[in-house]
């Protein structure tokens, strides 16, 4: 079966697409990889050393004045002046 001759522009586009794919695959191959067991150990280490106060049974409650999110929430509130609600409908 004779190979059909493609116009040069289409050949160039095919070559460019192939080169882009090749470069993408080279970048993916060069990316640092770790094994699943090392990733799990890293997650376990992170969760055992960083306190998560969303789980008070494990880490306890935050000390007063330690929660910087609460301070910013109090500063943002004076706009409406309503305690216990998020907005005021007029």
From Swiss-Prot:
PANTHER family from the UniProt entry: GUANINE NUCLEOTIDE-BINDING PROTEIN SUBUNIT GAMMA (PTHR28189:SF1)
Lipidation (S-palmitoyl cysteine): 86
Keyword Membrane: yes
Residues modified as Cysteine methyl ester: 87
Subunit-structure text: G proteins are composed of 3 units, alpha, beta and gamma.
Designated name of the protein: Guanine nucleotide-binding protein subunit gamma
GO biological process: G protein-coupled receptor signaling pathway; pheromone-dependent signal transduction involved in conjugation with cellular fusion
Matching SMART domains: G_gamma, GGL
Positions of the propeptide segment: 88-90
GO cellular component terms, A-Z: heterotrimeric G-protein complex
Keywords of the record: Lipoprotein, Membrane, Methylation, Palmitate, Prenylation, Transducer
InterPro entries: G-protein_gamma-like_dom, GGL_sf, Ste18_fungal
Keyword Ion transport in record: no
Membrane topology, from the record: Peripheral membrane protein
Lipid attachment, kind S-farnesyl cysteine: 87
Family statement drawn from the similarity comment of this UniProt entry: Belongs to the G protein gamma family.
Subcellular location: Membrane
Molecular function as annotated in GO: G-protein beta-subunit binding
């Amino acid at each position: 079966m004779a190979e059909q001759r493609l116009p040069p522009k289409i050949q160039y586009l095919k070559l460019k697409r192939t080169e882009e794919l090749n470069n993408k695959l080279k970048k993916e191959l060069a990316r640092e990889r770790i094994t699943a067991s090392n990733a799990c150990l890293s997650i376990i280490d992170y969760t055992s050393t960083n306190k998560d106060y969303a789980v008070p049974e494990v880490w306890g409650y935050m000390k007063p004045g330690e929660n910087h999110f609460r301070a910013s929430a109090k500063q943002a509130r004076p706009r409406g002046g309503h305690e216990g609600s998020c907005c005021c409908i007029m």
